[in-house]
């Protein structure tokens, strides 16, 4: 992984700005690697329609956000991407208010065009300087996003600022052990208390394997031949560096919940 923070952020922004232009499909709503839920989670948090396109990417949001019991709460997603996750949360879990911010203008434009959900709003914004008042939200979601931020410690300080007392950050991401340790340190320094920390690597690996035929078919159909290898790496397909590093334990995909004391 690229360790220079500014370069890493610029590379991710370039990727996220380019992706919608090459894959403008209105029904391609998600960019996460997907999640294969356990039977226990299906029982505890309910099932979703497993016939839907990209349902495992939808499941990543469902089994993260459902833990927040967001009904009648105000929810912010930082790094809302193509908007499918926030739309699922808004339509299925029915928060009082759902707002997404993303630093990629093309992603926000895609959301405005394809997600006309009355309770969801999409804005262009900076995760390190969020355009919101103090204590404005009950829940902050962050899905496979903050590893790309130039200043993750500042992002977590901003999360703590915009959360109400008793509110919580619900985050999933992929990184190596040393990088997770830094995130835990920055979380504590921001004044957030780690409440849940779960390794979900196997669930993600299984989702990647099961979704391989669909991803390959889409890439073959829409991506020029000379770019397919790059897109397979970006999508985390079977055989990609990310997939192999997840399988061999070099990096971990984790779900954390961090609470602002109230």
Where are these regions (language model features)?
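N-terminal auxiliary segments of SAM/dcSAM-dependent transferases
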Residues: 1-30
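Conserved alpha-helix/loop element of class I SAM-dependent methyltransferases that forms part
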Residues: 39-40, 54-71
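Class I SAM-dependent methyltransferase SAM/SAH-binding core
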Residues: 76, 82-129
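A short acidic, Gly/Pro-enriched loop at the edge of an enzyme's catalytic core
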Residues: 128-140
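A short SAM/SAH-binding and catalytic strip from SAM-dependent methyltransferases
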Residues: 139-150
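A short glycine-rich, Lys/Arg-flanked "PGG" loop and its adjoining helix->strand segment in the class I
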Residues: 153-165
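Conserved beta-strand signature within the Rossmann-like core of class I S-adenosyl-L-methionine
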Residues: 167-173
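Conserved Class I S-adenosyl-L-methionine
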Residues: 202-262
